[in-house]
Amino acid sequence: MDRKRKLICDAFKVKKLRGSCSRDETDLKTSTSPYPDFTEDPHGAVSYLCALFPRKLFNDTLPPLFLKHQLYSLMQDRTVVDRLLSSLQQKGEVCLVQTGFDLDTFMVVMTDDLRRTALSSSEGDSRATVVRKFLDCDLLLSPNISYGRDEMMMKHRFSDGEITQLVRAGLLTVRDAGSWWLAVPGAGRFITHFIKGRKALLSQIRRSRYKEVLLTDLSTRKAPPNLRLGMEFHIHDIIGAGLVDCVPTASGILLRISET
């Protein structure tokens, strides 16, 4: 793995055993956080994060995207998040999309939004017919995040040439020989901004005294230039990914750079 790819992989790593805040901190967290707690309304958390996505930054050419772990910053129980997404996948309402850098890191996109933007991006293109064929079959409604050769070629009758066109259209990426990940056309631009924004926000906190900052203070600061996705979007990222510890204080939640 070359150095550039390693840096990207490191940027997407999520600390698996860390919650956004511990259960003992629940009451203090909900009373002092500037953001809503969706413990009683899990579906609302999905809509909330979608609404944070800066459509204008991408000229409305991307569907609203967020990272799965960002939901962990809005609900106290990670199991609830996992069950919610599994249920929405089974219903064909959301798609989980592999980022390609860490097997445990997924982008979340509403199925209808992905369908709409994929059709729009291929309009007038030579690949429009095969894109529509892909969107009209039940692959998007499947809870699978990748597809094998038998499923693509035998069950859904896609030829090698059509699969190649879907890869070029950005709806598939090669997983390995004979299998493909579902993808979002143009998502590379989002990933670029996401990585730069995460690094910029963590750097800002590291420069603070004791490498910590009150959540309420951070949330009201003007976003530095590299936070193109927005301050709140990135705050939910670093909390949900366990890159900062949430420390309850009399003044509110303190975000401290995690050293573990």
UniProtKB/Swiss-Prot annotation:
InterPro entries: STK19-like. Coiled coil: none annotated. Residues 186-260 are annotated as: Winged helix domain 3. Residues 38-110 are annotated as: Winged helix domain 1. It is found in: Nucleus. Disulfide bonds: none annotated. GO terms for molecular function: kinase activity. It comes from the Eukaryota. Monomer in solution. Homodimer; when bound to DNA. Component of a transcription-coupled nucleotide excision repair (TC-NER) complex which assembles and interacts with the multiprotein RNA polymerase II complex when it stalls at DNA lesions. Belongs to the STK19 family. DNA-binding protein which is required for efficient transcription-coupled nucleotide excision repair (TC-NER). Acts as part of a TC-NER complex which assembles and interacts with RNA polymerase II (RNAPII) when it stalls at DNA lesions. This is Winged helix repair factor 1. It comes from Xenopus laevis.
